Amino acid sequence: MATNESVSIFSSASLAVEYVDSLLPENPLQEPFKNAWNYMLNNYTKFQIATWGSLIVHEALYFLFCLPGFLFQFIPYMKKYKIQKDKPETWENQWKCFKVLLFNHFCIQLPLICGTYYFTEYFNIPYDWERMPRWYFLLARCFGCAVIEDTWHYFLHRLLHHKRIYKYIHKVHHEFQAPFGMEAEYAHPLETLILGTGFFIGIVLLCDHVILLWAWVTIRLLETIDVHSGYDIPLNPLNLIPFYAGSRHHDFHHMNFIGNYASTFTWWDRIFGTDSQYNAYNEKRKKFEKKTE
């Protein structure tokens, strides 16, 4: 009975979304995107698309999303939004971070990316335009991937903070007490594999088109670079997402070393009480800001 009701609610929600979608004006970018997509399919093999296409998407988006935070350090106006104002970025730390990123991206992540083609072949994941999902189904699946990754990340991240193993693996990521965007994937190779597994679980369970791989990469990079940015920017549209952790939530984890273990959402920290120190800190901060107004 409950299952039938759930299916009925889901069907009604799908119909409602489809109806709203039919009322929206036609996307002027759809035709150019369709032509570009078909050009890619006609001129490159599936292996090239899945491997080199995925690598280009990851590298281009990673450093593009890092760029605003990198530029903020040169803009005096933005300093008031920096969370840990007493710990500015240094060229030495950023250069060290960049070198480790290149190693992780090309020596750890690239071999994993090379398996993308074989994954799509094994599970018969389509590439063609005709079977590309509608935007709302794509967003729904990306949200599902985010929930799965966040759950994996919370428990494995918390495990990596265990006193017996912390110094061997996760300590690398905590070398910078005040995070900055480029540091999002600065980690021990084993951590890259352990926490990165959460990214792929959602893909294995939910992927119905190769575009989901790239859409999920885009969302995950945007989120992880945002929470590592070190800046709490007003009117950040990501903060409109219910239960979104945000930069202050994760910045406290780097500052305090314990608590706030989740990557994207706040519910696991709230359920297990691992945000108690953060909540106390936040209350003190807000009281102090009121006094100084």
Curated annotation (Swiss-Prot):
TM spans (from-to): 55-75, 100-120, 199-219
Annotated consequence of substituting G115R: In MCCPD; uncertain significance
Gene Ontology terms, MF aspect: C-4 methylsterol oxidase activity; iron ion binding
EC number(s) on file: 1.14.18.9
Lipid bilayer topology: Multi-pass membrane protein
UniProt comment concerning the protein's domains: The histidine box domains may contain the active site and/or be involved in metal ion binding.
Protein name per its UniProtKB record: Methylsterol monooxygenase 1
Gene source species: Homo sapiens
Lineage: Eukaryota, Metazoa, Chordata, Craniata, Vertebrata
